[in-house]
Regions:
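GHKL-type ATPase core
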Residues: 1, 58-81, 92-215, 221
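Bergerat-fold GHKL ATPase/HATPase_c domain
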Residues: 1-35, 84-86
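Flexible hinge/switch segments at interdomain interfaces of large molecular machines
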Residues: 4-12, 55-56, 149-159, 251-266
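Bergerat-fold GHKL/Histidine-kinase-like ATPase
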Residues: 12-13, 25-31, 48, 218, ...
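Short, conserved non-catalytic motifs in the polymerase core
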Residues: 19-21, 99-101, 106, 262-272
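Conserved ATP-binding N-box helix of the HATPase_c
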Residues: 25-48, 110-117
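A conserved short beta-strand within the histidine kinase catalytic ATPase domain
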Residues: 48-54
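GHKL/Histidine-kinase-like ATPase module
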Residues: 175, 183-184, 190, 194-311
Length: 311
């Protein structure tokens, strides 16, 4: 028999198709999905602060100071835009070219997937002078959007508890989240991200917490990666340019070790397998340095042909 799975039901039936797997990796991916929404707001210039909290019960709360998810009635769906974003796959600002110039998020499945895979999710939106709130369970709304307070702030807070009947692991690892938030701070200079773990109380009575912020972005990232190595050049080479409306940024340095470490990203997503962006960079670097060496007659005495790997 042929089954047609509607909307979020499909996510609950085949979660791995949407978030990769249902173990530790997928569990942490839920947090990245929500944080990526806030980062998209930051990249559009509307958000400067993102706060991630691991609560005592291993639920997660992510707060930002962006514009807040829209709450007005969605024309086509006839429901609040907030409910549409949280219950319809591929809904949101990143599929319309005008809203975001850059957007991350996995395959654009977005925060509706997080909702589908959580026993409880609560969205609070600060927008138009009011606090709007809606709660969900396993992707289904428990009630319509309610106005619960007045406010002069803007932003979104999403709290969610991953579904233990879907995930084989439900305990969040602080270090995994810290690594990703640190990386996001380096990739998005000027934004502040904070991680707090309410499961760990320090001696002074405060919770374990860390703030990630970088003013110099990739340049600082390279220094951080290279911090334990012996440098060959005094500072990081940093290039920022734009080609056909697409911003490109490169930071590199040389040290005395023989192993290279290369990290490439597109829209904040680590492209582990490389791609044309990395291949193009390697070609450009090789060609430029080779030409410089030839023009400066540095290669006349060399007995061997130098290759890209030599750079």
């Amino acid at each position: 028999s042929i089954q047609v799975l509607e909307g979020l039901e499909a996510v609950r039936k085949r979660p791995s198709m949407y978030i990769g797997d249902t173990s530790e990796k997928g569990l942490h991916h839920l947090v990245y999905e929500v944080v990526d929404n806030s980062i998209d707001e930051a990249l559009a210039g509307y958000c400067t602060y993102i706060d991630v909290v691991i609560n005592e019960d291993n639920s997660i709360t992510v707060t930002d100071d962006g514009r807040g998810i829209p709450v007005d009635i969605h024309e086509k769906e006839g429901k609040s835009a907030l409910e549409v974003v949280l219950t319809v796959l591929h809904a949101g600002g990143k599929f319309d070219k005008g809203t975001y110039k850059v957007s991350g998020g996995l395959h654009g499945v977005g925060v509706s997937c997080v909702n589908a895979l959580s026993t409880y999710l609560k969205a609070e939106v600060r927008r138009n002078g009011k606090v709007h709130m809606q709660e969900f369970s396993c992707g289904k709304p428990l009630h319509d959007v309610q106005v619960i307070d007045n406010t002069d702030k803007t932003g979104t807070t999403i709290s969610f508890k991953p579904d233990g009947s879907i995930f084989t692991v439900t305990e969040y690892k602080y270090d995994i989240l810290a690594t990703r938030l640190r990386e996001l701070a380096f990739l998005n200079a000027g934004i502040t991200l904070r991680l707090t773990d309410k499961r760990v109380l320090k001696e002074d009575g405060s919770f374990k917490s860390e703030v990630f912020h970088s003013d110099e972005g990739l340049k600082e990232f390279v220094r951080y990666i290279d911090r334990s190595k012996e440098k060959l050049i005094p500072d990081v080479i940093h290039i920022v340019t734009e080609k056909q409306g697409i911003p490109v940024e490169v930071a590199l340095t040389y040290n005395t070790s023989y192993n290279e470490s290369v990290f490439s990203y597109v829209n904040d997503i680590n492209t582990i397998e490389g791609g044309t962006h990395l291949a193009g960079f390697r070609r450009g670097l090789t060609r430029t340095l080779k030409k410089y060496a030839e023009d400066s007659k540095l290669l006349e005495k060399a007995k061997v042909e130098i290759q890209g790997d030599d750079f």
